[in-house]
A protein has these predicted regions:
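Short glycine/threonine-rich loop-to-helix capping motif typified by GTGT followed
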Residues: 1-6, 32-40, 66-70, 121-126, ...
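Extended, well-folded interaction surfaces typified by the phenylalanyl-tRNA synthetase beta subunit core
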Residues: 1-110
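Short helix/loop capping segments that flank catalytic or ligand/cofactor-binding pockets
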Residues: 2-3, 55-58, 64, 81-83, ...
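A residue-level signal for conserved active-site and pocket-lining positions in enzyme catalytic cores
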Residues: 8, 47, 92, 132, ...
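Conserved alpha/beta core surface patches that mediate binding of polyanionic ligands
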Residues: 54-55, 86-134, 208, 219-238, ...
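A carboxyl-terminal module marker
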Residues: 139-289
Length: 289
């Protein structure tokens, strides 16, 4: 007897196989949602409430995905499935393009999926990411205004609102990663990082050359970030606490600074938060001139 099944076989032989019932016992159990499922469930609810649709694509892509570091297969069955994707964004762009050809102009979607990349040890890594695409639709806020496209800052605000709902502190910095050079706008792209400096993902506007090539709106925005990092960060966050509502009115102060053009608003915001008191609750950029 070397395995568990060997022991079960001996018990069955001694007890008698003909004495076993042919029906399964009724066992009522309550399933447990792991942290990964809970994270996806929460993100999905936030994005669905924001008007997004969940999309699903294959992990295998062709060689023309606007990204050069896709992992090629040695013996693919189809030319359209000849590589493992290194990003979710090409498939999202392709879906929007195909929908526009069919007259469906309102496609704002997100996708959970695995991406593949090589590391310094000449091995391959598989990570779970979430990516999304939105914008490109001209709307108006009221009857007296003309149709307007979603601006970069309004699109950024949507992502910031998502992070706020997830109770995540995310920092934005200038984009230097060359992986997305053919997909994202060179001057309207930002890298997202967590408090400890770990790179979370990327957000940006579609590259104008790619938009013209595919006959897409230039006001189209894409994001992609690591789902495992989001899960770990949410897990490490402190639970939300409730406190008594203040009986005093809030105080709003307007501050003006003269700074070098190389200094970003994020740096100023960090200094204000670090030196502010416990009563400081919110910092917003009002104007730049």
């Amino acid at each position: 007897i070397t395995r568990q099944i060997d022991l079960i076989e001996e018990i069955g032989r001694l007890h008698g196989f003909n004495k076993f019932l042919t029906r399964l016992p009724k066992i009522k159990t309550i399933g447990i949602e792991d942290s990964s499922y809970q994270t996806r469930k929460k993100i999905t609810a936030c994005l669905l409430n924001a008007g997004f649709n969940e999309l699903i694509h294959y992990s295998l892509v062709n060689e023309t995905t606007f990204i050069n570091n896709d992992i090629k297969l040695f013996n693919p069955l189809l030319n359209d499935c000849s590589s493992l994707r290194s990003s979710l964004l090409p498939n999202l762009i392709k879906t929007v393009t195909e929908n526009l050809k069919q007259g469906n102009f309102y496609v704002e979607g997100f996708e959970y999926g695995h991406i593949f990349s090589g590391n310094i040890l000449n091995a391959f890594e598989e990570k779970e990411y979430i990516g999304g695409i939105f914008g490109g639709i001209k709307t108006k806020l009221n009857w007296s205004e003309t149709l307007q496209s979603l601006s970069w800052f309004e699109a950024k605000g949507k992502i910031e609102h998502l992070f706020k709902q997830l109770n995540l502190i995310v920092y934005w910095k200038v984009h230097f990663n060359k992986t997305y050079n053919q997909i994202l706008h060179p001057y309207r792209t930002a890298e997202l990082s967590l408090v400890d400096g770990i790179n979370l993902g990327i957000f940006g506007q579609i590259h104008p050359i790619l938009a013209r090539k595919l006959n897409l709106s230039p006001e189209l925005y894409l994001f992609e970030f690591n789902l495992d990092l989001v899960k770990d960060q949410i897990k490490s966050n402190k639970l939300s606490t409730y406190k008594e509502y203040s009986l005093y009115p809030k105080i709003v102060k307007d501050l003006s600074f003269i700074v070098e053009q190389t200094i970003s608003f994020e740096e100023i915001q960090k200094i204000l938060r670090f030196n502010g008191t416990k009563f400081l609750t919110e910092i917003n950029l009002l104007d730049e001139y």
